[in-house]
A protein has these predicted regions:
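Large intracellular
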Residues: 1-108, 180-235
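Helix-termination/interfacial motifs at the ends of transmembrane alpha-helices
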Residues: 93, 97-176
Length: 235
């Protein structure tokens, strides 16, 4: 219930993450990959074990304050630093976890959609109750019966309108919002796997950039400008 109520508030944003959030994410991945490439995975150990105290991650506040995303990335960096640098193994595991995240994030949309599916039935029940009440007044003149039957049918109309004109679209918006939430984790995965496959740090984040939808995808020039302004990573 708390998760669903949180989604109602989040719908005002349109999407879970903006273009600026993704520029920051890609910049952070670039710093991580550059540090790992120049100083080795052991240099990442202090950042992996204490991400909330990491000076590296503190440079990227949106990511740093995202507990779930921080844990997601650091868990895989830890596995890699322990010696498992097989991209196929890491990708398979990341896919499994992302699928779990997707299922979790889809719960609010499914809950509201289930409610939307049941609302027309409530309208029908209201209509039937109205007809039953009308039948008890069958001896009344037609103009009275017409009003009573019309009142009964309002229940059906209201149920259909609420289901397909209000609650259903809200459920759809929640499902779309959940997809934007999951996209953040998939972008992390694409960057990490590209780096494990031997790509240079800048090429790895370019893979992640190209994966993003156009409405939040920074241009090559926007990202390059940001990367060029970053300080050199330190252990």
């Amino acid at each position: 219930v708390k998760h669903t109520l949180g989604y109602f508030k989040a719908l005002k944003k349109g999407g879970a993450y903006t273009k600026d959030d993704y520029i920051e994410l890609l910049s952070m991945l670039f710093m991580v990959f550059k540090l790992a490439r120049t100083k080795g995975w052991l240099a990442m150990e202090q950042h992996i074990e204490n991400p909330h105290d990491s000076e590296l991650f503190k440079q990227f506040p949106a990511f740093h304050h995202n507990h779930h995303a921080t844990t997601f990335l650091c868990d895989y960096l830890r596995i890699i630093s322990l010696g498992n640098e097989n991209p196929l193994t890491i990708e398979a595991l990341m896919d499994e976890e992302i699928e779990t995240i997707k299922e979790h994030e889809s719960h609010p949309g499914h809950a509201v959609q289930t409610m939307a599916d049941g609302i027309p039935a409530l309208g029908i029940v209201a209509a039937v109750l109205g007809v039953i009440k009308t039948m008890s007044s069958i001896s009344e003149p037609p103009e009275i019966l017409g009003k009573m039957i019309g009142g009964a049918l309002v229940g059906t109309f209201l149920g259909v309108w609420l289901a397909y004109g209000m609650v259903g679209p809200i459920a759809g918006a929640m499902t779309s919002y959940a997809a934007t939430e999951v996209m953040y984790y998939r972008a992390i995965k694409v960057g990490v796997i590209a780096f494990l496959n031997g790509c240079a740090p800048q090429v790895a984040v370019e893979f992640a950039r190209k994966f993003l939808p156009h409405d939040v995808q920074p241009t090559f020039q926007e990202l390059e400008e940001k990367l060029n302004a970053l300080p050199s990573p330190t252990a």
